[in-house]
């Protein structure tokens, strides 16, 4: 059936096309939908464009038109305005409301064109704002207020001689949370999200009020800067003291009651000694785990004995096979060294003639 359908499909012209018409002048490819609307069943008469047979002519219940795909038969869904029409009726124009989804009707009689989909999806927040025009107006007004406040904050900070880092430190003094210089910079540049801008504005508003009323704010800022610098100070231990700590660590890796005595003996703070021993234990754990893994790998060695081991290739085409049709193998050599006195086995080399000149 597939072969018969393909032959009829390729060469059967529609009815009414003689040798003189445009359809009969020369053979050509016929559009599948046009062919299905004109062509009758195999061995039956052709069907005109306005009249279609009923189920009694076909002998089977009506079904979607078949299409031949890759040697098999596949059924396609019904097309809008294309195919067989009811028996005894002429072709009628389909109203626009009954047209299929995604198809636009054309008054000129041309083929229907799919509707264009708008590029991209609109953000959820924007959709919510469009649904609530009153809320959208309130948010726009609040955004303008934030822009004006950001300009005021920058002017006030530069006029009083504060840096963005100073503002973050003073906020830490006032509210117990230090903000970074990057956060203040992004607020002034309106680069934070709308939600974060609204959260940070009351805190910065408090800073503006304190900067106008409190003259000692600059001194507080300097004191806080010194405290932050002291917190960030990196502890450095001399080589001699570090050597003594290493010796003590070998004797007792985890001292508890001896930390105070060790700190007093070496002239260090108790917290410094405690942190050093904690870091040293972590370093020892990492080193021991790496060493154990390396020992296990070396003890296991290679799963193959000495000498080449052949494996079949992976599935797929292989080019440049030296045997010209013989199975291709990849030689893997073991990393286990040969014992002393043992030499490599001789490798036999077979000279292959070129297949182009072979008789």
From Swiss-Prot:
Annotated SMART domains: HOX, POU
Biased composition (Low complexity): 299-309
Cell compartments where the protein resides: Nucleus; Cytoplasm
SUPFAM superfamilies per record: Homeodomain-like, lambda repressor-like DNA-binding domains
One GO term of the biological process aspect: regulation of transcription by RNA polymerase II
DNA-binding region, residue intervals: 229-288
Stored Gene3D superfamilies: Homeodomain-like (1.10.10.60), lambda repressor-like DNA-binding domains (1.10.260.40)
Entry comment describing in which tissues the protein is expressed: Detected in epithelial cells of the prostate (at protein level). Detected at the mRNA level in several cancer tissues (breast, uterine cervix, lung, thyroid gland, esophagus, colon, urinary bladder, and glioma).
Residues with Phosphothreonine modification: 235
InterPro entries per UniProt: HD, Homeobox_CS, Homeodomain-like_sf, Lambda_DNA-bd_dom_sf, POU, POU_dom, POU_domain_TF
Stretches assigned to the POU-specific domain: 138-212
Main location: nucleus
Phosphoserine: modified positions: 111, 236, 288-289, 354
Keywords: Activator, Cytoplasm, DNA-binding, Homeobox, Nucleus, Phosphoprotein, Transcription, Transcription regulation
Pfam families tied to this protein: Homeodomain, Pou
GO cellular component terms given for this protein: chromatin; cytosol; mitochondrion; nucleoplasm
PROSITE patterns reported in the protein's UniProt record: HOMEOBOX_1, HOMEOBOX_2, POU_1, POU_2, POU_3
Gene Ontology MF terms in the entry: DNA-binding transcription factor activity; DNA-binding transcription factor activity, RNA polymerase II-specific; RNA polymerase II cis-regulatory region sequence-specific DNA binding
Annotated segments matching region Disordered: 1-53, 87-116, 287-322
Keyword Phosphoprotein: yes
Sequence similarity: Belongs to the POU transcription factor family. Class-5 subfamily.
Free-text function comment from the UniProt entry: Shows weak transcriptional activator activity.
Name of the protein this chain belongs to: POU domain, class 5, transcription factor 1B
Organism of this sequence: Homo sapiens
């Amino acid at each position: 059936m597939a072969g018969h359908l393909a032959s009829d499909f390729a060469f059967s012209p529609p009815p009414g096309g003689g040798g003189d018409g445009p359809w009969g002048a020369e053979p050509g490819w016929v559009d599948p939908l046009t062919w299905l609307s004109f062509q009758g069943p195999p061995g039956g008469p052709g069907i005109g464009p306005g009249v279609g047979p009923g189920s009694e002519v076909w002998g089977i219940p009506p079904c979607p038109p078949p299409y031949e795909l890759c040697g098999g038969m596949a059924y396609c869904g019904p097309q809008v305005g294309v195919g067989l029409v009811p028996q005894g009726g002429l072709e009628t124009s389909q109203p626009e409301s009954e047209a299929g989804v995604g198809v636009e009707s054309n008054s000129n009689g041309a083929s229907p064109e799919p509707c264009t989909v708008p590029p991209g999806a609109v953000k959820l927040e924007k959709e919510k704002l469009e649904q609530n025009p009153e809320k959208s107006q309130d948010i726009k007004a609040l955004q303008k207020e934030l822009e004006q406040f950001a300009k005021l904050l920058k002017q006030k900070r530069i006029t009083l001689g504060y840096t963005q880092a100073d503002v973050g430190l003073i906020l830490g003094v006032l509210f117990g949370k230090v903000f970074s210089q990057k956060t203040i910079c992004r607020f002034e540049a309106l680069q934070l999200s709308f939600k974060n801008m609204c959260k940070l504005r009351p805190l910065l508003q408090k800073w503006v009020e304190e900067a106008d009323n409190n003259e000692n704010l600059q001194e507080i800022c300097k004191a806080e800067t010194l405290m932050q610098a002291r917190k960030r100070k990196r502890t450095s231990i001399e080589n001699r003291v570090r050597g003594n700590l290493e010796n003590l660590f070998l004797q007792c890796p985890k001292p508890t009651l001896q930390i105070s005595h060790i700190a007093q003996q070496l002239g260090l703070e108790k917290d410094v000694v405690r942190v050093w021993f904690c870091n040293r234990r972590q370093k020892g754990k990492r080193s021991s785990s790496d060493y154990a893994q390396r020992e296990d790998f070396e003890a296991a060695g290679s799963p193959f004995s000495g000498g080449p081991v052949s494996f079949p290739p992976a599935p797929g085409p292989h080019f440049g096979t030296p045997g010209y049709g013989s199975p291709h193998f990849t030689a893997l050599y073991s990393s286990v060294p040969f014992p002393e006195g043992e030499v490599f086995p001789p490798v036999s080399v077979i000279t292959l003639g070129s297949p182009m000149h072979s008789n």
